[in-house]
Amino acid sequence: KPTQAPSLVQEARDLRERLRDTESRADARVEEERQILEAHTTRKKLAGYAEIAQNIQYTEPILRSWRPPHFVRSRTEEQNEIMRKRYHVSVEGQDPPPLISNFRDMKVPVCVIEHLRTKGIQAPTPIQMQGLPTAFSGRDMIGIAFTGGGKTLTFSLPLLLFSAEAESRVPFQHGDGPIGLIVCPSRELARQTYESIKAMAESLELGGYARVRALLCIGGVSMSEQSHILRHGVHIAVATPGRLQDMLEKKIVQLHSCTYLCLDE
């Protein structure tokens, strides 16, 4: 008995089913690839290829000599939260350092505090109240604040004091450093940050602390102009991405001893 040929309606229905199955498999494959890529990207965060290859994971902050005053350490977390609400500070993360509302209790040298006062800075801003203790403690952080909120001081002051401490322990020589790198999106911002650090470093030296040398790495600035800094070792490098890459390729600057990284803006 001859078999009846499927109708056009049935053929269309079968075709739609096959296309639906094909699309489902394709979507599943795309989703699987997306998850693999996301997992790989997450794993690469703040880690180099050598660290990933050796499965090195960092679970502890860099040890620093700075400690908050005893009365700050003895505050309860509830008291810390009350202070954060008072100054409109929002914090996320595990066991954040306590907020400190003045530079003196942060143990900032008097000479630096006096220098800040000459610049019209009498007290820390909200991001500095939380961000400075965080950086002083050796913790990683992402700081968000409005323009003019004091972000530059939040990342530059801890690096300056860490550098002075390192120089006082073992004086830097030619080829040493930097121990801190600040990457800025523009030459103008990099120069402003560099000038701010340089002024604070001079006030710190006048106060009897070790000399801290900063290097400005931007287009238009010849390295021959800063050769004296390179000869004595560099504590802090302030750079734009393009110039930094060029100096790394030419081995003018090495990052083997860099333990402090800031990506500005």
Where are these regions (language model features)?
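Intrinsically disordered, low-complexity accessory regions that flank the conserved helicase/ATPase core
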Residues: 1-105
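The conserved Walker
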Residues: 145-149
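Short coil/turn segments at secondary-structure boundaries
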Residues: 118, 129, 156-157, 194-196, ...
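Walker A/P-loop NTP-binding motif
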Residues: 129-141, 152-173, 196-201, 245
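Short amphipathic alpha-helices and their capping/turn residues within compact interaction modules
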Residues: 108, 113, 117, 121-122, ...
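Conserved nucleic-acid-binding Ia/Ib motif block in the N-terminal RecA-like helicase ATPase lobe
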Residues: 111, 171-249, 257-260
